[in-house]
Amino acid sequence: MNRMKKAVSLAAALVLMLGCACAFAAGNGRIRYEGEGFATPEDALACYMEGLKNLDFEQMMSAFAWETQMEHYDLRVFLERIGAYQVTMRPRMPSINDFMFSANVNVLRFYQADLIYRSIEAYILGDDDPAKAATGSVTFESNSDDVGAFLEKFENGRLEKLTQMTNIRFLSPDEITDNKFSVGPNPEAFIRQTACYGADEAVNLVGVADVGDETLYCYPTICRYGDRWYLVSVSSFTSMIIGVSNLNQAFVCGPGSLADLIR
């Protein structure tokens, strides 16, 4: 009986090893995360916004260039523009081999996903967001139901309200920056900021939609590689001009004007 168990275990291990080997051989050791890209920047942004409406995180992530971005990314240009190397930067190490390329792709995905995650949290919690507390955190009393009461705040219906999103439309950066995007040193600054992406073309586009009695805004950087468009970042030169906080980099949604929402 023991011999049979050992034989079965060995066979299972061999099947698993062969399966893994075949999977890596087929993809040259890489998993490819990005989709086929989009014909226009509007199509790319619509995919992102519709993913939010559908409460489909993977659909939102499918709007981005992951591998293509890292294949063209110029870290030297980025560091020369910033003038510093900081451990908060993502990505921050060169893709000198397949291992580092894969590491950078995954770090990039984590970073953008975390920005979306943070904006969703801020949207759901509103004034109860820990970032709005003086301490920057929420503390719980022992021997109380503070934790339960806090967790219930995530079931307030805000997330589900996003499924009411309608009338997706697009604005130029100038339409929400009082034309600041296209005047003075800003056009050249935009070119410098986006040069690190190594894209054939980079644009900022503002997505707007109605969510019940509220308005949603997002303002990503979108790039063209060849004839395909992708998001490369949820943040942008536009969001920098209007002063979007770290809470709302991926999107902001609420009543009132954009200026009111990001204040």
Regions found by a protein language model. Give the residues of each.
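Sec-dependent N-terminal signal peptides of Gram-positive bacterial secreted proteins and lipoproteins
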Residues: K6-A25
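Low-complexity, intrinsically disordered terminal/linker segments enriched in charged
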Residues: F154-N156, E160-R263
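Residue-level detector of alpha-helical recognition elements and their boundaries
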Residues: A63, L75-R76, F237, V244
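N-terminal secretory signal peptides that target proteins for export/translocation
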Residues: M1-R3
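Low-complexity, serine/threonine/proline-enriched polar segments
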Residues: Q86-V183
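Short, low-complexity N-terminal intrinsically disordered segments enriched in polar/charged residues
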Residues: C22-S62, W66-Y73, E80-F110
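Short, aromatic- and cysteine-enriched interfacial helices/patches
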Residues: A26, I124, L261-I262
